[in-house]
Amino acid sequence: MEQYLKVYDALHKINIPYEIVEHPPALTTEEADNYIVGKEGVRTKTLFLTNKKKTAYYLVIMDDAKRLDMEYLAEILNEKRISFGSPERLMKKMGLPPGVVSIFGLLNNDEQDIKVYLDKEMLSERLMSFHANDNTKTIFISTEDMYKFITSIGYEYNIIEL
């Protein structure tokens, strides 16, 4: 099954409405933003991170306009150091290549060993945008439905201030 169809199927099963925008391939949030100009909602970036020993995995979701202070995040996570997960580890854990990471990749994490962190600053917005596990599709869902999606597939999320 195509990756994006898994996303649509999961959203339909839990009655989450969404809007989809199809566009040419976009490997960065900046590229994707060019195709969704004028649409309401936070343009999110989703970062797949790991600790130094590669024994813990994190998905950090934040406004794409914001820069992440990795040292500060490592402190919050009680880790000595964090870094981006390798493309190979990302494929193994989420079934996705770089440039396509979003909360919907959690659908592919059979071990359910990724911890989810949401930046508090963006959560007052009504809508969020994500890749639909395909970099030719941007999906918009409400912030409340984002919470619902995460918990419906068996994950907890943590709200942090970045």
Please provide the spans of the model-predicted regions.
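Extended, low-hydrophobicity, polar/charged segments
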Residues: 1-162
